[in-house]
Amino acid sequence: MQSINIMKRHWLSLAIATFGLTLIFNPVAAHAEPFGFNLVPASDPIATCLPDAVARVTVFPREEIRGVDTLELRAHGLRPNTTFAVFLTEMPVPPFGAVQYIGDFTTNAHGTGSVRVDAIIDEAFAFNNITGVRTDLNHVVFWFADPADDEDCVPGSAPAHFDGDGESGVAAMSSKNFLPGAPLP
């Protein structure tokens, strides 16, 4: 009887120790903290045209838990009732390099808008299977989704290709304030 109690205590101690070590060495716990950063106007003409523009990106790294991270972008001081296309990019300035289109948001009558995207953000990359080159996408940039919407800021600008229909305006906000580094790991 006494040997059974000793054995039960041994197994209980082992279970508690295993659980404790799992909590201490769990890699998910080390990477699960949300982090945020600000975007700035993508160019001097945009900064002049939208002097109150502010955009905040918050990333919730949850890929190890949910299979995806969450990126939340909140902006204000933009053009009212305007749609913007959001991308992860290799570089925050032209020519931008490799990019990934992740979503759109439309501002309200006060120039405020937001978007929440579930995707792999913390480890986003583009891969060229022909060259074998992997390119990390460590920046966030958003463009005017309609080329006509940027005309007050950058008159006569040529349409860019940063939208789902292949035609956009100029870049509005970017993470260029992190150069030469990047805000995403």
Where are these regions (language model features)?
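Bacterial N-terminal signal peptides that target proteins for export
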Residues: 2-15
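Generic cytosolic/nucleocytoplasmic N-terminal low-complexity/intrinsically disordered segments
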Residues: 4-7, 25, 175
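C-terminal segment of classical bacterial N-terminal signal peptides
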Residues: 21-29
